[in-house]
């Protein structure tokens, strides 16, 4: 009985090791570029069925190479693909991973704005969480060029596209000097 149990455990461990070994191929930049190329049709439209596989490859590369100088870039692209697929939970997860793992990368503030706008505001219609993402960008990256976009996004939260256009038009009209018109 003991020998049968040992043999069973050994067999299960061997199968597990073989199964894992097949999925842990070390990905290279070339692998990612090939995956990226497979994402598009000839007319540059997205192959929707390929998108999840490509995003997963990007994540796998980051997991295997967390210190690589391009890891934050690939993680951002994985997040972008998930946003495009309207996979809100995965998009938020990847944004959180990116801002925690690579807070000093150029992609961290972009991820906050992207998820605030496209996930919380557009997909989930959660203006409170969208506001929180914009505010996090403003607070944690005060010198980033995207801060102004985040401030405008907060100003426009909850407005329809028509209301936003009306505000922009009014703002532009207010900037015009009346004396300039009279001349």
Where are these regions (language model features)?
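C-terminal motif of bacterial Sec signal peptides marking the signal peptidase cleavage site
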Residues: 16-19
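Structural register within alpha-helical repeat arrays
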Residues: 41, 78, 115-116, 154
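Short solvent-exposed coil/turn linkers within tandem alpha-helical repeat scaffolds
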Residues: 61-71, 99-108, 124, 138-152, ...
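Residue at a conserved register position within TPR or TPR-like alpha-solenoid repeats
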Residues: 82, 119-120, 158
